[in-house]
From Swiss-Prot:
Chief localisation class: plastid
Membrane topology reported for the UniProt record: Multi-pass membrane protein
Protein name: Fucoxanthin-chlorophyll a-c binding protein D, chloroplastic
Name of the encoding gene: FCPD
Pfam families given in the database record: Chloroa_b-bind
GO biological process, alphabetically ordered: photosynthesis, light harvesting
Organism name: Macrocystis pyrifera
């Protein structure tokens, strides 16, 4: 495989430019780069959903029961990492089974497209996406990539602070805004 240069790829932009401190792409070809970019985009999307879910669950809960057999209501579920310890084993198996199904059967990258294109030939926003200039599409992809990177750091920070002192919302502490977490 021929050694490639990735300084001009989407996401290699100010202020860091191309940043690969672990050298994951030191001897990589375009195929390896695209595989790692695919993984980065997917993890970024999951992290953006995780941040939204963490903040939503902190302020609102669904009515009703999560598990009748375990006598567990949605209101009884803790937020954050602690929720994993309350989900019944059968529920965890369902969650991981569904994730596995999505990973193996549904969320496939469109061949010949950019990493992270999961349109599967049925993108409901295709007409608006296709109407954008190539420059605008690249800008949107760079924005998504950077928001995903920020969300990955954000959800990691929430989990670390939750484990350190059960106070994940550092900004509330800095501003003196009280909150109850779990």
């Amino acid at each position: 495989a021929m050694k490639m240069s990735f300084e001009l790829e989407i996401g290699a932009q100010a202020p860091l430019g191309f940043w690969d401190p672990l050298g994951l792409l030191a001897d990589a070809d375009q195929e390896r780069f695209e595989r790692l970019r695919y993984v980065e985009v997917k993890h970024g999307r999951i992290a953006m959903l995780a941040i939204a879910g963490h903040l939503t669950q902190q302020n609102a809960r669904l009515p009703g029961m999560l598990s009748n057999s375990a006598n567990l209501s949605f209101a009884d579920m803790p937020n954050g990492v602690a929720a994993l310890s309350k989900i019944p084993p059968g529920g965890l198996a369902q969650i991981f089974g569904f994730i596995g199904f999505l990973e193996l059967a549904v969320m496939k990258n469109v061949e010949g497209s950019f990493p992270g294109d999961f349109t599967l030939g049925g993108n409901p926003f295709a007409s608006s996406w296709d109407a954008m200039s190539e420059e605008t599409q690249e800008s949107k992809r760079a924005i998504e990539l950077n928001n995903g990177r920020a969300a990955q750091m954000g959800i990691l920070a929430l989990m670390v602070h939750e484990e350190l002192n059960n106070k994940p919302y550092v900004i509330n502490d800095l501003l003196g805004a009280s909150y109850n977490f779990n």
